[in-house]
Amino acid sequence: MGEFTTPTPGPVTHPTLVFEEYDLPNGLHVILCPSHSVPLVSLNLWYHVGSKDEDPKRTGFAHLFEHMMFQGSKHVKKAEHFRYVQNVGGTLNATTNQDRTNYFEILPSSELELAMWLESDRMMALEVTEENFENQRAVVKEERRQRYDNQPYGTVYENLLLRVFPTSGYHWSTIGSMQHLDETEIHEVQAFHKQFYHPNNASLCLVGDFKRDEAMRLIDRYFGVIPAGPAIARHPQVIEPIGKQVRHVMYDNVQLPAVYVAFQSAHAYSEDEYKLDIVSDVLSKGRSSRLYRELVYKQRIAKEVNCYNLSNEKAGMFMLSGIAQIGIDIERVEEALWMELAKMRADLADAQELQKVKNKFEAGYVRSLTEVGSRADHLQRAWTFKRNASLANGELQKLLDVTAEQAREAAIRYLTPEKAVVIHVLPKAMEPSSTDKS
């Protein structure tokens, strides 16, 4: 019998997005990323407009247009966009955040032209009418009631943004203000549409099973004829650092008290984004993470804990939270959160702990690259925020390269008590009466 030897593992290689990009004369940026593993194609269209680009006195417009875009265009009647796509076995949706609005279809590759026609028609000739506006204003107001105003802890995020980013467009949420929705007139909505929804403020990404030359021909046919829009004057985003701790108490329709601690963090594609991602995952990724292990299992003072780092185009927010167990003072939960942050600043994460969070991130990232829509989002985010789609191929390695010392250093620089916004959410039954306040 021959001698058995264990092969030496070689360097790990990760999937790479192979793509090309170009601009149409009207300013539309195009990214082509072919993949023939499955007979599907994703058309992913990003408009570089989010809630931060709105007038502070007229918030919620970017999200409003997430709805308005399905209300009909010159050749597509109201709600027909859904019917066309679903009738050929496709899916579609739209999302809005503080920096961009995303519209996408995933269809059988034989139906690529259908997606081109639908998206180009509403880019060229969306029906921004009084009737459509009134209809969708009512829909958005109801969405706000259900997802924010009538949801336990539903308005905490808005209150955090207001205090973490008091001087920039990041200080309101995408859903916008109910008052602003009520006061808005149709001419203001039309002006917002004219300002932002045109080829030179958009990027189109195709991912999946398509032929390059045919795709380029269709893009030119359907999008090349759309005229460019006006040059965009954006509101400057002034991110004033938090000089001392800000505290706030909210009384809400909740059963259990909660505490939220938030900090300004790093913007997208900065080196610190990846360091703070590691910190947040060490603290809360999985049930063996530090916050779960200490507050939920060991001390049994929290029913639920959470932590994340959200890096946007111009700024970021790092947030951690805990919901108290029955009978536990929320001050104990806050103190425990601060203790875990102090440990992050004082001590290095051990090698096993660090590798575990990296493994989870790596698995999730590689899994996302198996989906045509996720691949498009990776490329679009890099292009829209940094005008460099190639950054999408370096993100995973940047995170895997973060050392325990770099993570600790980021925690020291960003996550200190004097830079925090702290919100306690208490049951309304705990609110002092008017007599107590006097």
Regions found by a protein language model. Name each.
Residues 117-122, 217-223, 333-338:
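Short amphipathic alpha-helices in soluble, non-transmembrane regions
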Residues 50-58:
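Short pre-active-site segment immediately N-terminal to the catalytic Zn-binding motif
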Residues 1-51, 75-111, 147-201, 225-270, ...:
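Non-catalytic beta-strand/loop surface segments
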Residues 71-76, 123-131, 347-350:
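Short, polar/flexible loop-turn hinges at active-site or ligand-entry regions and domain interfaces
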Residues 59-73:
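Active-site SXXK
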Residues 216-232, 345:
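Glycine-centered hinge/linker elements that transmit conformational signals in sensory
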